[in-house]
Design a protein with these regions (language model features):
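Residue-level detector of buried hydrophobic side-chain packing
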Residues: 13, 83, 152, 228, ...
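Beta-strand-centric surfaces of beta-sandwich/beta-rich domains
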Residues: 62-69, 98-295, 300-408
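Cellulosome-associated attachment modules in secreted, modular CAZymes
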Residues: 5, 67, 407-466
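Glycine-rich, acidic and aromatic/proline-enriched surface loops and short helix-turn segments
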Residues: 50-54, 305, 317, 432
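Short clusters of hydrophobic/aromatic residues that line enzyme substrate/ligand-binding pockets
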Residues: 35, 57, 202-205, 413-415, ...
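Aromatic- and Gly/Pro-enriched helix-to-coil junctions and flexible linker segments
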Residues: 2-139, 225-231, 460
Length: 466
């Protein structure tokens, strides 16, 4: 940025804050303070400068230089420099006419009218004792037969304490029994659902994220009589807070020809027993063969409080080709997510999936639940650990690399699905530049990534996609 440029809130800072921060930092949401106008942002200007400079905010755990995902919240170097220059320049307000205005934050569904709404049977009251709580709620579906769905959408009843949610499926009735045995609504579940559910990762929600909305012909099946499980993470609160979360069910508009399956890499894929000695940093490397051509939709590495990093990728049989999937250099259990690729990502038959996780079981790990550090094994408790990589996939078909998984809208150049055409989209396009056939990105429809695609994107650069 040119040093002579005068940086103001309305012209330069508001577009950054409103697009990347305000979805959480507004009244009734999980952010501890609102960022909806000049006065609110200016009051925390120095704090914003610091947490963005060190990459602590916005909270996005995957390394955006390793792989891109739909809806990623990552500031560019230029945006961070703009925030810093604004603070250093005295936090000038500027001309209100330059302000782009707040984005539209819908109260209800973000993707349409649901076919069914599943609701918690009664409100859950989260205690005002400044602790995190993980509670599993059992939502009966009561479907007469199997149903094919294109989307599940979590609508938290209280955004001020709802931190994230993970969805599962149960057909055994076990979750309902655990619910009945707990005097509170639902039952406590820290690391998972407390038993071997039919699906332990059927979907997820984090603040500001759009639900996964499968392309036509792709979907999932909810079996007849199944219960949808919702593991809610409630963040610390100084006051009691009531929540009544709902799950919107969207049935497939066309017959589902390609069922989404979840591949799970777990401890059985490790070459060593899953044991974490005290006062040591331990790494594990899991591998899983790819026996058919597949296309990946989502990925979610999962461990607990001692976990410190993840790296997931695929390699060719001759180790000459590596497909990056996700890197989480600083794992934070409280900000785990369910990450959707911008386009279906092909992994050819014969490749090998790799999952590398590091665990810091030392006293220097502030998240370590044991003081002093102790031996830790596999389990669902707070003091236990896990090694899982959940990957949603379908069998590969020609043209999959061009099937977009981001939200539909007026901006085909919004490759990362973050609702604005910006630097991250340029970088994603340049990563495929020079492709001449079967390209994962093709904006002008000529089955290649050339200068015309770059010009197409630049023509939409800076466009908000709402």
């Amino acid at each position: 940025m040119a040093s002579a440029q005068v940086v103001t809130f309305h012209a330069d800072v508001a577009p950054i804050i409103f697009n990347e921060c305000t979805s959480c930092h507004r009244e009734g949401q999980i952010g501890p303070m609102p960022f909806t106008n000049y006065a609110e942002v200016a009051a925390y200007g120095e704090f914003i400068e610091y947490v963005t400079a060190i990459g602590y905010m916005p909270p996005w755990s995957p390394d955006a230089e390793y792989a891109h995902f739909v809806g990623e919240k990552v500031l560019t170097v230029e945006e961070v420099e703009t925030l810093s220059a604004w603070v250093d320049g005295g936090k000038l307000e500027g001309n209100p006419e330059d302000n782009p205005g707040l984005p539209d934050f819908p109260d209800g569904s973000q993707i349409g009218t649901p076919d069914h709404v599943l609701a918690m049977p009664e409100p859950y009251v989260h205690g005002g004792d400044m602790t995190d709580q993980y509670q599993v709620f059992v939502l009966p579906t009561a479907f007469d037969g199997d149903v094919s769905i294109r989307a599940l959408e979590v609508l938290p009843g209280n955004h001020a304490v709802a931190h994230h949610a993970i969805l599962g499926l149960d057909v055994s009735g076990t979750a309902a029994q655990m619910d009945d045995a707990d005097p509170d609504p639902g039952y406590e579940g820290f690391g998972g659902f407390g038993f071997n559910a039919l699906s332990s990762f059927f979907g997820a929600w984090v603040p500001g994220a759009l639900p996964v909305n499968y392309p036509p012909g792709i979907g999932r099946t909810i079996p007849a009589g199944a219960d949808v499980l919702v593991q809610m993470h409630y963040g610390p609160s100084a006051l009691e807070a009531s929540d009544l979360t709902e799950v919107n069910v969207f049935l497939s508009d066309v017959p589902v020809e390609r069922e989404v399956y979840t591949a799970i890499m777990g401890p059985q894929h490790l070459g060593a027993p899953f044991v974490l000695p005290p006062d040591e940093v331990t790494s594990f490397h899991g591998t899983m063969p790819v026996t058919e051509d597949v296309s990946l939709l989502n990925i979610a590495p999962h461990c607990h409080l001692i976990g410190s990093s993840w790296l997931v990728y695929a390699t060719s049989p001759d180790n000459q080709d590596t497909i990056p999937l996700i890197s989480v250099p600083e794992w934070d259990f409280n900000w785990q997510g369910y990450f959707t690729f911008p386009f279906l990502k092909k992994i050819p038959q014969g490749y090998t999936l790799h999952g590398e996780a590091t665990y810091d079981n030392t006293a220097s790990n502030p998240a370590n639940p044991n003081d002093p550090p102790d031996w830790v094994g596999f389990g669902e408790g707070t003091t236990d650990e896990m090694f899982f990589v959940f990957i949603d996939l379908v069998l590969f078909e020609e043209g999959d690399e061009s099937v977009a998984l981001g939200p539909p809208g007026p901006c085909p150049a919004d490759l990362t699905g973050d609702l604005v055409v910006g630097v991250s989209d340029v970088l994603l396009l340049l990563g495929d530049f020079g492709c001449l056939s079967a390209c994962s990105i093709d904006l002008d429809g000529d089955d290649a990534v050339t200068v015309s695609d770059v010009l197409f994107l630049l023509g939409q650069y800076g466009t908000p996609c709402e």
